[in-house]
């Protein structure tokens, strides 16, 4: 089974790809889809659409896990929600089942506390995937944590 975890955003979409082989979690890839901040919102959303389609075609994940978004009073709220909509649409188009997780649920599952720090989450991701270096940028570490949350739910602790 192969999973892709997604940390949504308009400027950067973090992704992390993990595979289960012989009951073990194997790190495959992580990174970010970065959009051109000098382009309009529609063009940036299209970049996310294109690049996520390319990632899916390359890695062929069986399932996806995406961070749930909660509304905060922020100027970026609408942009993130729009980006997340594009992400969900791509998975629907590719017939990939999506599970959604709140940030506090990811932190609790991965680091043992719903209020875990960014550092604690990164350390837990490194431990769970036997990584010697922290995934960079942080958006990709978050995406791996989201994927690990789904795998934990599936019984791969």
Swiss-Prot record:
GO MF term set: crossover junction DNA endonuclease activity; DNA binding; magnesium ion binding
Binding site for Mg(2+) 2: 67
EC number, UniProt record: 3.1.21.10
GO biological process, one term: DNA repair
A GO cellular component entry from the record: Holliday junction resolvase complex
Catalysed reactions listed for this entry: Endonucleolytic cleavage at a junction such as a reciprocal single-stranded crossover between two homologous DNA duplexes (Holliday junction)
PROSITE patterns recorded: RUVC
Cross-referenced SUPFAM superfamilies: Ribonuclease H-like (SSF53098)
Compartment(s) of residence: Cytoplasm
Class of the enzyme per the UniProt entry, highest EC level: hydrolase
Cofactor remark: Binds 2 Mg(2+) ion per subunit.
Residues noted as binding Mg(2+) 1 in the record, renumbered to the chain: 7, 139
Cofactor (UniProt): Mg(2+)
Protein family per UniProt: Belongs to the RuvC family.
Function: The RuvA-RuvB-RuvC complex processes Holliday junction (HJ) DNA during genetic recombination and DNA repair. Endonuclease that resolves HJ intermediates. Cleaves cruciform DNA by making single-stranded nicks across the HJ at symmetrical positions within the homologous arms, yielding a 5'-phosphate and a 3'-hydroxyl group; requires a central core of homology in the junction. The consensus cleavage sequence is 5'-(A/T)TT(C/G)-3'. Cleavage occurs on the 3'-side of the TT dinucleotide at the point of strand exchange.
Matches recorded under PANTHER family: CROSSOVER JUNCTION ENDODEOXYRIBONUCLEASE RUVC (PTHR30194:SF3)
HAMAP family: RuvC
Subunit structure: Homodimer which binds Holliday junction (HJ) DNA. The HJ becomes 2-fold symmetrical on binding to RuvC with unstacked arms; it has a different conformation from HJ DNA in complex with RuvA. In the full resolvosome a probable DNA-RuvA(4)-RuvB(12)-RuvC(2) complex forms which resolves the HJ.
Protein name: Crossover junction endodeoxyribonuclease RuvC
